[in-house]
A protein has these predicted regions:
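Extended substrate-binding grooves/exosites of carbohydrate-active enzymes
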Residues: 1-203
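Aromatic-lined ligand-binding clefts that engage carbohydrates, nucleic acids, or primary amines
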Residues: 206
C-alpha cells in the first residue's frame, strides 16, 4: 500500500570468527568469497526501484576484504550509498550505521562539528516479545536532528516454519518442535510481523 525503502545486504556474516585478527574480513584468502556475494547482490537488485542503500554485510569485522567490496560497489554504483556497520568511521561506509546504540550516543554523534555521514541504526529495538520500549525517545531525536536518520528494527518478520499436526491442520513451529537438539527455542520469534506476515494483534506493530 505504501511501499518500502529497502537496504539490500550482501549475504556475508561471520561474527563467529570475531572482529579481531581472526576475522575473515582481514584474511585475503577470503576475498573471492566476499566479492562473489557482493557481485551477486548487486547484479540481482541493481534495477530494483525499492533498493536505496547497499550493505556490505553484517557483523563480520572490517578489513581488506570489505575495503575491496566497497571500492568495487562504488565503481559501479553512482547514486546509491553503501553502508557497513563494522566500518564504523573508516572510509568504507557512506553512513555511520551502528547497532543497538543508546539515544545519548546518537545525540553525542550528531552534535559533533566534524561529521559528514548521517547516523542510521542498522539494528535497534530487538522486537522479541513485548519489546520496542523507548521508541519515542529514539524518534524524538530522529525527527529533530537532520543527521539522525532512523533505523531498522530487528526483526521485521518472525522466522517460524509451518508444521503439520497429527490430527490435521498446522502450526507455526520453532526450535525443538522438530525434535532438533540443540536449539534456540523461540528465539526465531522476534519480528514485528508473524511468520505468515500477518499482523500480531497484541502487542500490535502500531503500538
Amino acid at each position: 500500500r505504501y511501499g518500502l525503502y529497502m537496504i539490500d545486504e550482501a549475504n556475508i556474516e561471520s561474527h563467529g570468527m570475531g572482529y579481531g585478527s581472526a576475522s575473515l574480513a582481514k584474511d585475503s584468502t577470503w576475498l573471492t568469497a566476499h566479492m562473489d556475494r557482493t557481485h551477486r547482490m548487486y547484479e540481482r537488485s541493481k534495477n530494483h526501484p525499492a533498493i536505496v542503500i547497499w550493505s556490505l554485510g553484517n557483523e563480520s569485522g572490517n578489513g581488506i576484504n570489505f575495503e575491496r567490496t566497497y571500492d568495487w560497489l562504488k565503481s559501479v554504483e553512482k547514486n546509491r550509498p553503501v553502508q557497513y556497520e563494522r566500518a564504523e568511521e573508516n572510509y568504507n561506509t557512506d553512513i555511520y550505521c551502528r547497532m543497538y546504540r543508546s539515544v545519548d550516543v546518537i545525540k553525542d554523534y550528531v552534535s559533533r562539528k566534524d561529521i559528514y555521514r548521517p547516523f542510521i541504526l542498522c539494528e535497534y529495538l530487538h522486537a522479541m516479545g513485548n519489546s520496542c520500549g523507548g521508541m519515542k525517545e529514539y524518534w524524538d531525536v530522529f525527527e529533530s536532528e537532520p543527521m539522525a536518520q532512523g533505523g531498522c528494527i530487528w526483526d521485521w518478520v518472525d522466522q517460524g516454519l509451518y508444521k503439520s499436526l497429527p490430527g490435521g491442520g498446522e502450526m507455526i513451529a520453532y526450535g525443538g518442535d522438530f525434535g532438533d537438539r540443540p536449539n534456540l527455542k523461540a528465539f526465531c520469534f522476534n519480528g514485528i510481523l508473524r511468520s505468515d506476515c500477518l499482523l500480531y494483534t497484541s502487542p500490535s506493530p502500531r503500538d
